C-alpha cells in the first residue's frame, strides 16, 4: 500500500449521457482514491482501478493543484481531470521506467485488439502482456493482436475506456485466480521496443474512463469523442455481389488460363459476382508491380476479355519490394523504404521474401511513387482496383524511423498506410485499421483456418464481425468462405455453414469453388447469395446511419437488451440494424440451435412463427439447408 492515500475522496459532478435527448440528466458520480484503488462510481456501480502499481511501497503521495485531482509521488505524478462524461487519468513519470494501472473486470468487457480466438466478451481469453500494436497475429498466435485494433474497451456496467495515442502501451488480461477468466485489464507504459520517444521526453500514460447508464449508452456517447465516422459508402456492387478471389482455390499457382477458367466457371453456373480478384503471384518479382510475362503474357487482353464478360478485375498488392527485384535499387536510392536514424534502409522479412524493403508510408514522396505505379498499372492493363494486403506495424524492421511524431511510432505506419491506399476509392479492401474509421472502405478479417472451432475457425467469424463494428469499421469483409485451406480444404458441411454464416454480413467473398463439392453445395451457396442481395437495401440504410452516428451495421445482441446476461454473452448471433437477427449454425452436425431473442415480437423466417422476447429458444430439426434469421415485428 502506498502511504498517504487513505481517505482521499473527490466528488465530481459528471454529466452522464441520458437516454432521452430532450430530458438530459445529470448524475453525481464519485471519484474515490482509497487503498491504492481509484474508483469511478456511476449509475450501475463503479469502475475499480488498481493504480500506480509500479510506485514503490511506502511512497507518500502529496496533493498537488493540477487538474481536478492531483497526487505527486516524487517518482511519478497522476492528474485526474473531468472531461464531459469522462475522467482523464494522466500519469507522468520522473524516475520510473514503467507506469502501470489495472482495471478490475467486473461485468463483461468488449473491444481492444483483433484476436486469433476473438472471444466475446474478452474476459473469456486471458492474455499475457504484449505491446499493443497492429500485428500479423498469424505469425505469433495467442501473443500478438491483429491489424484491426483500437485501444478502446467498453463494459456491460456502462464504462468505456480509451488509452490515448502516444502512450507506449503494453496490455495484458491476467487470470489471477486460475479459473481461465481474465480478472483485470492492465495498461503498462514503457519506452521499450517497438515504441520510441524523443530524447529526454518523460514517460507518460494517459487514458479516459467514461460512463453511461449501460453498455450501449456508454459506447454511443464515448465513441464519437475518440473516433471519426465513415465519410461515405464503399462500392455498392461489393455490398451486393460476391468477390471471387483466386487465393484459397489456387494459392500461388495462378496464371491467365486459370483466372479465365475461374471466371467462366462462376458465370456458367449462374453465380452473381462483383469482381474477380487475382491474388498472390501475379508479379514478375514481389514488389515490382509488373505482371509475370510467363504467367500473364498479355494482361490487358485478359482484363479486357473479363470486362467483356461483365467482370471487374482487382489485384492483390502489398507494401514490400524484395531486394532481388529491379525496382528495389531505385526505391532504395530515393529513400522510399523505412530507414534507420542514419538514413540506411532496414530490411524486413515477410511471407514471400526473406530480404525486402518496406515502403515508408509516412514519407510523402514514397507514397506518391508507390501509388503512381499502381495507377500506371491500371492505365496500362485496365485493372479496376486493388486488394491491399499487410500494413501491420509488426512488419517494420526492429531498427526504424518514421516521418511522424515519435510518440506515435510504430502504429502510425498502419494509419498512414490506410490513409494512402484509400485514395483508390471504395472498391478496395484492407486488412488493417487503427484510427482510420473515416475511410469508407471494406476492412477484411485476417485469414481464417478451414476448421470449425474457436482457434481462428468458423466460430470466430461472428465475434470478429462484432469486434470490427464496435471499433468503428462497419464494412466488414469476412475473408474467404470456407477459410483459406492452408492445410486441408473444408468438407461440404463446413463450407455450407461458412457460407450461411456470411449471408447477412456486409460482403461475401468466395474462393474455394462451390461446384468443387457437389450440386447440393452449389445450390446452398446460390441461396446464400440470393438472400444476401435481399438485405442490401437495409445495409445501405445502415451505412448511411453509420456516417451520422457511428453505429455499427453488424450489432451485438446486447444492443437491444444491454441489461440481460444472455444478451451480453451471445457470441454466435448478431443483429443487422435493430430489427433483423441472424443466428448461423456453427457446430458440426448440429440439429438444434439456441437463440437469444431481445425484447419484441420476432418472426422466424423459416416457419413464420412469432416469439415474444426477451427469451432464449431452442430450435429443433436443424438441417444443412437451415439459414436461421428473424425479423422484429413493428409495434402498434
Identify the residue ranges that each predicted region occupies.
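Cleavable N-terminal signal peptides of Sec/SRP-targeted secreted and luminal proteins
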Residues: 2-20
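Short, flexible N-terminal segments of the mature chain
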Residues: 52-61
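Accessory, solvent-exposed terminal regions and/or long lumenal/extracellular loops of proteins
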Residues: 634-636
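Short, conserved catalytic/metal-binding motifs centered on acidic residues
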Residues: 69, 78
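Catalytic-domain carbohydrate-binding cleft regions of carbohydrate-active enzymes
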Residues: 23-48, 55, 66, 81-82, ...
Amino acid at each position: 500500500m502506498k502511504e498517504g492515500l487513505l481517505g482521499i475522496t473527490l466528488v465530481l459532478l459528471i454529466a452522464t449521457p441520458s437516454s432521452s435527448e430532450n430530458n438530459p440528466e445529470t448524475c453525481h458520480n464519485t471519484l474515490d482514491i482509497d487503498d491504492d484503488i481509484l474508483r469511478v462510481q456511476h449509475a450501475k456501480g463503479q469502475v475499480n482501478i488498481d493504480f500506480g502499481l509500479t510506485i514503490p511501497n511506502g511512497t507518500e503521495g502529496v496533493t498537488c493543484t493540477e487538474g481536478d485531482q492531483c497526487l505527486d509521488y516524487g517518482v511519478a505524478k497522476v492528474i485526474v481531470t473531468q472531461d464531459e462524461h469522462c475522467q482523464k487519468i494522466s500519469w507522468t513519470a520522473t524516475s520510473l521506467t514503467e507506469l502501470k494501472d489495472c482495471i478490475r473486470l467486473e461485468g463483461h468487457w468488449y473491444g481492444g485488439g483483433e484476436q486469433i480466438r476473438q472471444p466475446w466478451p474478452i474476459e473469456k481469453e486471458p492474455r499475457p502482456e504484449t505491446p499493443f500494436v497492429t500485428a500479423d497475429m498469424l505469425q505469433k498466435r495467442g501473443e500478438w493482436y491483429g491489424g484491426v485494433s483500437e485501444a478502446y474497451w467498453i463494459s456491460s456496467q456502462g464504462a468505456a475506456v480509451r488509452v490515448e495515442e502516444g502512450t507506449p502501451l503494453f496490455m495484458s488480461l491476467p487470470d489471477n485466480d486460475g479459473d481461465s477468466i481474465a480478472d483485470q485489464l492492465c495498461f503498462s507504459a514503457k519506452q521499450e521496443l517497438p515504441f520510441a520517444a524523443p530524447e529526454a521526453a518523460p514517460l507518460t500514460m494517459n487514458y479516459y474512463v467514461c460512463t453511461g447508464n449501460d453498455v450501449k449508452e456508454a459506447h454511443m456517447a464515448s465513441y464519437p469523442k475518440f473516433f471519426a465516422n465513415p465519410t461515405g459508402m464503399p462500392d455498392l456492387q461489393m455490398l451486393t455481389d460476391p468477390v471471387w478471389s483466386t487465393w484459397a482455390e489456387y494459392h500461388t499457382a495462378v496464371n491467365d488460363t486459370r483466372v479465365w477458367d475461374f471466371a467462366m466457371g462462376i458465370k456458367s453456373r449462374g453465380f452473381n459476382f462483383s469482381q474477380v480478384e487475382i491474388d498472390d503471384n501475379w508479379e514478375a518479382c514481389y514488389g515490382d508491380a509488373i505482371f509475370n510475362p510467363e504467367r500473364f503474357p498479355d494482361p490487358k487482353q485478359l482484363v479486357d476479355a473479363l470486362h467483356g464478360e461483365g467482370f471487374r478485375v482487382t489485384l492483390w498488392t502489398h507494401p514490400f519490394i524484395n531486394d532481388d527485384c529491379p525496382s528495389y535499387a531505385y526505391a532504395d536510392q530515393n529513400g522510399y523504404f523505412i530507414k534507420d536514424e542514419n538514413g540506411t534502409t532496414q530490411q524486413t522479412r515477410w511471407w514471400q521474401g526473406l530480404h525486402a524493403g518496406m515502403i515508408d508510408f509516412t514519407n510523402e514522396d514514397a507514397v506518391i511513387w508507390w501509388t503512381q505505379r499502381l495507377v500506371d498499372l491500371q492505365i496500362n492493363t485496365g485493372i479496376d482496383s486493388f486488394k491491399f494486403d499487410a500494413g501491420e506495424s509488426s512488419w517494420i524492421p526492429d531498427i526504424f524511423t518514421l516521418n511522424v511524431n515519435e510518440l506515435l511510432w510504430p502504429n502510425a505506419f498502419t494509419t498512414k498506410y490506410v490513409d494512402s491506399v484509400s485514395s483508390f476509392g471504395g472498391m478496395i479492401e484492407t486488412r488493417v485499421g487503427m484510427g482510420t474509421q473515416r475511410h469508407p472502405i471494406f476492412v477484411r478479417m485476417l485469414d481464417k483456418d478451414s476448421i470449425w472451432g474457436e482457434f481462428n475457425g468458423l466460430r470466430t467469424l461472428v465475434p470478429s464481425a462484432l469486434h470490427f463494428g464496435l471499433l468503428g469499421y462497419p464494412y466488414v469483409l469476412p475473408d474467404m468462405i470456407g477459410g483459406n485451406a492452408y492445410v486441408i480444404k473444408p468438407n461440404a458441411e463446413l463450407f455450407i455453414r461458412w457460407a450461411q454464416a456470411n449471408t447477412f454480413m456486409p460482403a461475401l467473398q468466395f474462393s474455394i469453388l462451390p461446384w468443387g463439392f457437389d450440386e447440393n453445395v452449389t445450390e446452398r451457396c446460390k441461396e446464400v447469395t440470393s438472400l444476401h442481395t435481399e438485405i442490401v437495401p437495409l445495409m445501405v440504410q445502415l451505412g448511411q446511419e453509420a456516417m451520422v452516428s457511428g453505429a455499427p451495421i453488424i450489432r451485438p445482441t446486447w444492443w437491444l437488451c444491454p441489461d440481460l446476461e444472455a444478451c451480453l454473452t451471445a457470441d454466435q448471433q448478431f443483429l443487422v440494424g435493430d430489427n433483423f437477427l441472424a443466428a448461423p449454425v456453427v457446430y458440426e452436425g448440429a440439429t438444434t440451435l439456441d437463440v437469444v431473442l431481445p425484447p419484441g415480437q420476432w418472426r422466424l423466417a423459416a416457419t413464420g412463427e412469432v416469439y415474444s422476447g426477451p427469451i432464449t429458444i431452442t430450435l429443433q430439426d436443424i438441417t444443412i439447408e437451415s439459414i436461421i434469421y428473424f425479423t422484429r415485428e413493428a409495434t402498434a
